[in-house]
Design a protein with these regions (language model features):
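Glycine-rich ThDP/TPP pyrophosphate-binding loop and its adjacent helix/strand module
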Residues: 102, 108-112, 123-140, 144-255
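Cofactor-binding active-site loop characterized by glycine-rich and histidine/acidic residues
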Residues: 3-141, 148-149, 154-165, 179-180
C-alpha cells in the first residue's frame, strides 16, 4: 500500500536576499582552500534545510569532513562505503516508510540526500545508485563532480575529460594527450536507464541560486531524483584557490 510521506513544498529562491541564513554545513572541516565540492555541500545543505539526512560515501567530502570531534554537519549525517551510498539511502527511506505505516513516526519525512563524488556516483558506486533509481526510492542522489578521484591522489575517473592529466594518465612521449577516453555523461546515464527517475538536472557552484533551486525542485518531488553538480578542485586541477568560481563559470560557458 502506498504511503503518503512527503508534504513539504520548499519555495524557490528568487534573489540573493532570499537565501536561507541558517547554515547546515558549518566551519569544522579540512577541505583544501578553494574547494569546489565543499562549496556545493554548503549550498545543497542550505537549500535542503534542517529536516535532512546526508549520506556520505567515501570520498573527499567524507575524509575532509569527518575528523574526530570536528565535523561540519548541523544535520544527521552517515558515512557509507564508496560502493553503497544508494543502498544505505534506500534502507533509510524504506525504514521511514515502515515507521510511518505503523504509526511509529509522527514527524515530517526527512530529505534523504546521498552526496557522492563522481567515483561514488557513476563508477564504483554506480550499481547501488542505479538500483536506488530503478526501485523508485524517494531519495535525492547528488553527484558532486570534480572530475577525478581527488581524495586518493588525483587518479582518473569516468568523468575526467579527454586529455586530462592525472596520476594515472600523465601525458608523455608515448601518450602525449594524457587520458584517451571520453567521459561519461552522468545525467544522460541516469535518464536513459531509469524509467522511475522523476527529476534530473545539472548545476554548477558558479551559480548558487540556480543550484539551490534545483535542489529544492528535486526535494519537492516524490521519487528518485538526481543532481549532477560541477565542482572544480584546485588541487586536482592545479589551479589557484581563488579561481574556483571563475573556472566553474568558464566550464559552463564552454559546455
Amino acid at each position: 500500500m502506498a504511503v503518503a510521506i512527503k508534504t513539504q513544498n520548499l519555495p524557490l529562491i528568487k534573489k540573493i536576499r532570499n537565501i536561507p541564513k541558517e547554515e547546515m554545513y558549518v566551519p569544522g572541516h579540512r577541505t583544501c582552500a578553494g574547494c569546489g565540492p565543499a562549496l556545493q555541500y554548503r549550498l545543497v545543505a542550505k537549500a535542503a534545510g534542517p529536516n535532512t539526512i546526508f549520506l556520505g560515501p567515501t570520498g573527499c567530502m567524507y575524509v575532509a569532513n569527518a575528523s574526530y570531534l570536528c565535523t561540519p554537519y548541523a544535520v544527521p549525517w552517515m558515512h557509507t562505503q564508496i560502493t553503497n551510498g544508494g543502498a544505505v539511502a534506500s534502507g533509510i527511506e524504506a525504514a521511514y516508510k515502515v515507521l510511518i505505516r505503523k504509526g511509529k513516526w509522527q514527524g515530517e519525512f526527512p530529505n534523504i540526500i546521498v552526496m557522492a563524488g563522481d567515483g561514488g556516483a557513476v563508477d564504483i558506486g554506480l550499481q547501488a545508485m542505479s538500483a536506488l533509481m530503478y526501485r523508485g526510492h524517494d531519495v535525492l542522489f547528488v553527484c558532486y563532480d570534480n572530475e577525478s578521484y581527488a581524495n586518493t591522489g588525483i587518479q582518473t575517473s569516468p568523468t575526467t575529460p579527454y586529455g586530462g592529466n592525472t596520476t594515472f594518465t600523465p601525458p608523455g612521449p608515448m601518450i602525449p594527450e594524457g587520458k584517451k577516453l571520453y567521459p561519461k555523461d552522468p545525467p544522460q546515464l541516469v535518464i536513459g536507464g531509469h524509467p522511475a527517475v522523476k527529476y534530473v538536472a545539472t548545476a554548477s557552484v558558479a551559480y548558487p541560486i540556480d543550484l539551490m533551486n534545483k535542489v529544492r525542485k528535486a526535494l519537492n518531488v516524490v521519487g528518485p531524483t538526481f543532481l549532477h553538480i560541477h565542482a572544480p578542485c584546485p588541487k586536482g586541477w592545479k589551479t589557484d584557490q581563488d579561481k574556483t568560481v571563475m573556472l566553474a563559470k568558464l566550464a559552463v560557458e564552454t559546455g
